[in-house]
Amino acid sequence: MRAHDIGALALLAVLAVAGCREGQAVELPPLPGSAVSLDSLGQGVVDGFVRGDTARLRGYVLSLDEYRDVWPRLQIDTTAGFGFDWSWRDNRLRGERAFRRYLAGFHEMSLTAVETRCTGDPHRFEGVTVLPGCTITVRDSSGATEEMRLFKSVVVIGGGHKIFRYDD
């Protein structure tokens, strides 16, 4: 075999492998602190606020590095001047305000998450799915249930579930 034949075979092999990947979903590993399911995320959030477990609650929110990795995958139009820095600051400010309010309001209440649902159409991106329209149905000690919106959207990466921020 001549050198250019070997090069051509190598190129064909690379193209064949690349062709096998085309159209397949990118599978990323779950992020640290992710919940294994939507219901476990809702239960973890409710339990965290009731118990005042700030480390657990903060672990469910995308960190700066995670947000930095997810942001470009979302294909957000930044031509209006609302780029990554603005989005990160806005999420942190609004999320922290809601976090403090829920932490004070739910501490030591007798609440159990019954169901967590996201009713919006899923948005799929490279290795990331965003589930909008999320609510948690909670039950109190009297048996009464209420639907709450502690976060609006869930980010699913590698089967793990996290949130952008707590919503007010």
Locate the predicted segments by residue:
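Generic detector of short, well-ordered, non-transmembrane alpha-helical segments enriched
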Residues: 16, 53-54, 150
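Short, low-complexity N-terminal intrinsically disordered segments enriched in polar/charged residues
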Residues: 20-55, 59, 63, 67-69
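Surface-exposed, charged secondary-structure patches
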Residues: 72-147
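Short beta-strand edge/turn micro-motifs at domain boundaries
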Residues: 21-26, 122-168
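Short linear functional motifs in flexible/disordered or boundary regions
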Residues: 69-70, 166
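Extracytoplasmic/cell-surface-exposed regions of Actinobacterial cell-envelope-associated
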Residues: 51, 66-67, 74, 93, ...
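Sec-dependent bacterial lipoprotein signal peptides
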Residues: 1-18
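Residue-level marker of positions within ordered structural domains that often coincide
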Residues: 1, 62, 159
